[in-house]
Amino acid sequence: MAAAARWAALGLALWLCAAAHAEEPEGKRRAGPAKKKDIRDYNDADMARLLEQWEKDDDIEEGDLPEHKRPPAPIDFSKIDPGKPESILKLTKKGKTLMMFVTVSGNPTEKETEEITSLWQGSLFNANYDVQRFIVGSNRAIFMLRDGGYAWEIKDFLISQERCADVTLEGQVYPGKGADGSEKGRNKTKPEKAKKKKDAEKSKSSHEDNRAQTKQREDL
């Protein structure tokens, strides 16, 4: 609202200046000092510079500032859970633009991906989440958030959907409900291997103890 009002005021000021310039007598205009550029010949770059100069002494609402000029949101360390690293990321990404990649399962066409992700976006919109969506492949889309603090809540919603294969957020891949067996088992592979290795070491140690006890009996 504030930005729109400033543009309207700027346009009105330029129009008044142009009208005043047109009404000046020809002789007076020639007698005056030569201007670098007629205001009626301003292009978009000139308008942008003029607006920037105008805004130097103007109070701009924080929400109208570009993201790189906004002051960082204060972090409430009392809300950080040491056992949940995601809680730290939520606070550090609050108020910042964030993107996540979403993969649709079932080898869909680009049109199907468009329809499915559109339904997800609509559900998020109804839940008051401001999300933009861009299709980047036959089965992939980007969900962009203006406030990254809500990214993990949106991720939880997406991975609970039947056709969501996975969500990639901040370099971390989260398997979705629609992931196939290999995707779902990916995170379980390492714990299972570690358990088997531990059991093998335990069994080996037990055999060595039995051999040592048997040898002691034979020596006696």
Curated annotation (Swiss-Prot):
Alphabetical list of PANTHER family matching this protein: LRP CHAPERONE MESD, MESODERM DEVELOPMENT CANDIDATE 2
InterPro entries documented for this protein: MESD
Organism placement in taxonomy: Eukaryota, Metazoa, Chordata, Craniata, Vertebrata
Protein role: Chaperone specifically assisting the folding of beta-propeller/EGF modules within the family of low-density lipoprotein receptors (LDLRs). Acts as a modulator of the Wnt pathway, since some LDLRs are coreceptors for the canonical Wnt pathway.
Biased composition regions of type Basic and acidic residues, renumbered to the chain: 180-220
Signal peptide: 1-22
Keywords: Chaperone, Endoplasmic reticulum, Glycoprotein, Signal, Wnt signaling pathway
Gene Ontology cellular component annotations, sorted alphabetically: endoplasmic reticulum
Residues covered by region (Structured core): 97-170
Name of the protein in its database record: LRP chaperone MESD
Glycan attachment positions: 187
Gene3D superfamilies referenced in this protein's UniProt entry, alphabetically: 3.30.70.260, 6.10.250.640
Naturally occurring in which organism (per UniProt): Gallus gallus (Chicken)
Disulfide bonds: none
Gene Ontology terms: biological process: protein folding; Wnt signaling pathway
